[in-house]
Structures are given as C-alpha cells and as structure tokens.
C-alpha cells in the first residue's frame, strides 16, 4: 500500500512517454507534447512531494524533481515548438533516460537520499548509452 503513490507516479510518467512514442515516426500536432509536458510538470510536483524532513533531506527530492523536469520537460518543449518526428523521438528518448531521475526523486522523498542520488546518477549514463544505441 505504501508503494502505490510512487507506482502511480511512475505510471503517469510512462503514460506520457507512451503517448509521445505513438508519434515518434510521423511527428505530432503541437498539442500532444504540450499535454505531455503538463503531465510531466504534475509528475515532478507529485514526486517532489511534501516532506516533514529538514535540511538536505527536504531539499533533495525537490532538486531531483527539478532535474527530472528540466531534462524531460525541455525535450517536450522543443517538440511542442517543432513537433516533427525527430523532436518527438528525442522527447521519447529523454523520457526513457529520465526515468532513473524520477525514481531517485521518489526514493529521496522517502528519506533514502543516498539511494536516490545513486539512482539519479544513472540518468547521465543512460543518456550516453542512448547516443550509441537507440532508446526506442
């Protein structure tokens, strides 16, 4: 039962990536990446969550959620500005490689700061790997 909110947050993220992936070959109308960006903002806000913790343990989930939102959200904003197949595909890749940051945010929110940082640190590695092997 404790894991349900985190699972729903990851499911919402996965939904945004899946919605974009349906248009990564043909491109999309600009409303799709705008809608998924709105969903991503909600996911980031939910993942950051309210915390009763103090100090860096309270700041860490917010910082990681900001990192997630910046990385994935920027790609969606670019796709909204120019919703061709390449930009939509790039947004899908950003969503896939941004998942470890989201998971790290959720871990940090529960108080597992070191685990959260370790998970989030996988995101840059994933981005490097995607340059060699397609994420999709």
Set out the residue ranges of the language-model regions.
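Short amphipathic, positively biased membrane-proximal segments
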Residues: 1-136
């Amino acid at each position: 039962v404790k894991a349900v909110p985190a699972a729903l947050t990851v499911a919402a993220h996965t939904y945004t990536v899946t919605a974009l992936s349906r248009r990564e070959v043909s491109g999309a109308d600009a409303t799709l990446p705008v809608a998924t960006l709105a969903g991503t903002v909600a996911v980031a806000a939910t993942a950051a969550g309210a915390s009763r913790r103090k100090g860096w343990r309270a700041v860490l989930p917010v910082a990681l959620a900001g990192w997630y939102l910046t990385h994935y959200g920027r790609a969606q904003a670019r796709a909204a500005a120019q919703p061709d197949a390449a930009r939509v595909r790039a947004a899908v890749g950003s969503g896939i490689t941004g998942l470890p940051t989201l998971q790290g945010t959720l871990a940090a929110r529960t108080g597992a700061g070191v685990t959260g940082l370790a998970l989030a640190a996988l995101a840059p590695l994933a981005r490097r790997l995607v340059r060699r092997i397609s994420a999709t």
